[in-house]
Amino acid sequence: MNDTMAIWFAQIVGREVHLVDYLEGEGEGIEFYADELNKKGYRYGGHFGPHDLAVRELGTGLSRSDVAKQFGIKFETIPRISNHAEGIQAVRQFLPVCWIDEEACAQGVNCIDNFRKEWDDKRGVYKDRPRHDWASHGAKALETLARADLFARLSRQDFAKSRPPSRRGNWAAHT
């Protein structure tokens, strides 16, 4: 079983998504990542994870989402996609609104740069699915973030509650 965890840290700034940090590791439980999130000192507006957070562990009967709740992380599960092309297209539409801290996100950017389709040696063509290797974890984590529809979530009450009140009132940008 592969237990690699990849986390992108995003900040909404106007009509942009700033990818400000990236964390990846393996061989650690959710409690480790909860501790790492707390150490970062960020104020989180939400946590978004893939559909497999609902998988229940045989030993405890708890899902990964249940375990995360015990450490103060409430995930919104992003539904499974019907095909890989849908996820790739979501990232293609998402990236133009992103600004990436190249230093803090270097490992994640490397994953995106190296995410590839899998080659079928027998048939001499690419398969219709991506290659599952070290780069796929960061790329799939970005896909999950891209499909989280962050801008729509800004207007939701529970997401807005986590943001400090503005002292400037209502400002708008005109283009």
Residue ranges, per PLM feature:
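Mg2+-dependent endonuclease catalytic cores in nucleic-acid-processing enzymes, primarily RNase H-like
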Residues: 8-133, 152-153, 164-175
